[in-house]
Each structure stands twice: as C-alpha cells, then as structure tokens.
A protein has these predicted regions:
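Cyclophilin-like peptidyl-prolyl cis-trans isomerases
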Residues: 8-177
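Cleavable N-terminal signal peptides
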Residues: 1-2, 12
C-alpha cells in the first residue's frame, strides 16, 4: 500500500514539474494545477506540442519580470516569427477565463500575461524577478520556478519602459520532467 501510495504521489507531483531549457541551463517549474487548472492544462498542452520551443523572451524588465509565450509571432523557429509583433499573439485556442488566487506574485512566480481584459490570457506568461504585489489577484498565478532562478536572472534585459528586447534570449525547449 505504501509503495503504491508513494508511486501515485510521485507520479502526480512529476506531472506538475516542467523543464524549461535555456541557453545557460535548465529551469524547473512547478505548476499549480490545483489553483489554476485551466491555465496549467493550456501550458502543458502547448508545451507537449512543442509550441514553446524557440519562443523568445520579447519583454524583459529588469527588477520586474521576463515575458515570453507568444507562440504565434514570438517563435524564432517559425515562418511567422516577427519580433516587432511578438507579444501581440497567442495560440489558436480560445482565451482563458481568469483563475485568480491569493498566491502572491513573489520572486520566481509564473503568471499568465493578458491584455486589459482579465479573461484574455492565452499562451503568454511571465516570471517575476522580484515581488510584484500590484499584480496580486489581478493576474493568474499558475506556477513557480523551483530550480534555476539564477538562469532566469540571466535572461537578456530589454530597453525602455516597455522592456522590448532587440536580440532576445529564447526558450530552447519546454517539456514535462
């Protein structure tokens, strides 16, 4: 019984761990399927299809966050790649309804990027460099960096107030552990 229980818990846990390969190494992400099941399901689905592989970090604001996930215009491996449009696209799937929680936007938090409409998240996400309490309960938190945050800190920073990156770093691959 104990062995079966351990196997079940380990399998359940491993299904919520993803590996994001960056140029400097691997980052482990723990997904919060209990807090944001629809956002986690979307993230996993796009990752399993390889749609995040090659996607750039198009918006990176030092001391705030690194944003990626535009699978339409931000995929450097795609014929549709257009850095000037990166950040305006998403997947072909419908937008997601918000799944706000009381989890604070602390350092390492993985959260869904969206427009001014709280129900407009699709494929884009951001990772916080430090606490951003002004985002709490306004953006859907769906995971956290549990290993390799120092690699997120190394992502090339953008310029100006919007944090646009001219020669951006990219996600090499994103897969379940």
């Amino acid at each position: 019984f104990i062995l079966v229980f351990f196997f079940f818990i380990n399998k359940l846990y491993s299904e919520d761990i993803m590996i994001m390969k960056l140029k400097d190494g691997d980052v482990e992400l723990e997904l919060y399927s209990d807090q944001a099941p629809n956002h986690v399901a979307r993230f996993k689905s796009l990752a399993e299809k390889g749609l995040y592989d090659g996607v750039v970090f198009h918006r990176v604001i030092d001391g705030f966050m690194a944003q990626s996930g535009d699978v339409k215009f931000g995929n450097s491996n795609s014929k549709d790649f257009n850095l000037s449009l990166a950040g305006t696209g998403g997947s072909d799937m419908p937008d997601l309804k918000s799944e706000f929680s009381d989890i604070p936007h602390d350092r390492g938090i993985l959260s869904a990027a969206r427009s001014s409409d709280p129900n407009s998240a699709n494929s884009q996400f951001f990772i916080c460099f430090q606490a951003a309490p002004h985002l709490d309960r306004q953006y859907t938190v769906f995971g956290k960096v549990i290993k390799g945050m120092e690699l997120i800190d190394k992502i090339k920073k953008g310029e100006g107030a919007n944090g646009s990156v001219k020669d951006p770093d990219k996600i090499i691959s994103l897969k379940l552990k």
